[in-house]
């Protein structure tokens, strides 16, 4: 019997957040929502608040605070606004687990606050570990905070390592779907990619930013950096394999050559429920695998055609603040692509220019990372005027 977990959902109106609330809705005996956080999707946030009755609702964009406050004025729900309010909400004593499903750099500060308070983190915001992996893992150890990955690949690796304490890990095999353009062979094909085509992922239902990252293979690059810190494994021991079926979510090879893999339907509710249940499995009625209908294939990623993956390996090799630069430039690149201001293939050009211009700092703190993130974003927006 799972003890009831009290959850703060950061990014409740996004793809991961809404799927997490589906899990809660199906297992109200196991989970209780105490905090909901959204950026500006007020209509959905208000509906979620009325359904789940959290103690606190936070709208991070303060311009929408009056609307949310008015809509919930007849309830006992406390309504707060702004980034500081998010950090305040996650450390409440009635929060056991903080699901960090905010997109991008914005998830870093509340994650740090929750870790410092010793909370359990269900980590979906991979950018947090990309930008500040060494700092995050060090603080988690110091404050006794547990970090459980929500990304399907990292959840798979985590599950493969259960029961293997003390057994040397030789290699992580990080699987990738390859995205919607996996079969493309020429640069010209990628240069002609439209936003609509890039948003059509073949296997997964995700938010716009993650879907574009998946199409460009940057998502796998960010996940590689995340895996480096989560599992204390050097980049040279993390191999990316394209697995178009998205059934094998990742694998781990041990020193004796044995390999463990975690398989399942491409459904984010599975790793979400595993993390929220603190690795205790909750029953569900989701579709099951039929192995007689499956074919598993593997390919090497084409890092010449999709240079973002190579750029991620390069950023990790440079170390220090280089991954922060990679992340900031990528966020601007994706934003510009979605707005029709930058071509699909040109996103990697913008990111490469940001990395080339940066001299990594070996030691850093939150203030330095915040200042660097802002500076790289500004510089990248300026470079947009010179890239097509």
Predicted regions and their residues:
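Catalytic, metal-anchored helix/loop core of enzyme active sites in primary metabolism
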Residues: 1-388
């Amino acid at each position: 019997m799972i003890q009831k977990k009290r959850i703060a959902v950061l990014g409740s109106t996004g793809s991961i957040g809404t799927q997490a609330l589906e899990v809660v809705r199906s297992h109200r005996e196991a989970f209780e929502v105490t905090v909901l956080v959204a950026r500006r999707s007020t209509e959905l946030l208000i509906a979620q608040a009325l359904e789940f009755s959290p103690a606190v609702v936070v709208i991070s964009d303060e311009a929408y605070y009056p609307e949310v406050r008015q809509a919930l004025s007849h309830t006992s729900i406390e309504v707060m606004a702004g980034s500081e309010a998010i950090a305040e909400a996650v450390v409440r004593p009635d929060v056991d687990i903080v699901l960090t499903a905010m997109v991008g750099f914005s998830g870093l500060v509340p994650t740090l606050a929750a870790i410092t308070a010793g909370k359990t983190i269900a980590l979906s915001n991979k950018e947090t570990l990309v930008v500040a992996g060494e700092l995050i893992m060090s603080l988690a150890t110091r404050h006794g905070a547990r970090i459980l990955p929500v990304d399907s690949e990292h959840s798979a690796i985590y599950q493969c390592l259960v029961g293997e304490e003390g057994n040397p890990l030789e290699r992580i095999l990080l699987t990738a779907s390859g995205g919607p353009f996996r079969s493309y062979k020429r640069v010209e094909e990628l240069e002609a990619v439209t936003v609509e085509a890039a948003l059509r992922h073949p296997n997964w239902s995700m938010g716009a930013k993650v879907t574009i990252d998946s199409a460009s293979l940057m998502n796998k690059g960010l996940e590689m950096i995340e895996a480096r810190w989560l599992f204390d494994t050097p980049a040279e021991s993390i191999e990316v394999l394209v697995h178009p079926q998205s059934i094998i979510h990742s694998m781990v090879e041990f020193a004796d050559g044995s390999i463990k893999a975690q398989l399942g339907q491409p459904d984010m509710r599975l790793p979400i429920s595993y993390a929220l249940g603190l690795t205790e499995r909750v029953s569900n009625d989701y579709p099951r695998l039929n192995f007689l209908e499956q074919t598993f294939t593997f390919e090497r990623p084409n890092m010449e055609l999709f240079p973002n993956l190579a750029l991620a390996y390069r950023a990790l090799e440079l170390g220090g603040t280089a991954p922060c630069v990679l992340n900031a430039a990528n966020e601007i690149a994706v934003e510009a692509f979605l707005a029709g201001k930058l071509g699909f293939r040109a996103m990697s050009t913008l990111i490469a220019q940001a990395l080339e211009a940066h001299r990594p700092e070996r030691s850093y703190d939150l203030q330095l990372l915040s200042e660097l993130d802002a500076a790289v974003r500004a510089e990248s927006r300026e470079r947009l005027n010179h890239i097509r």
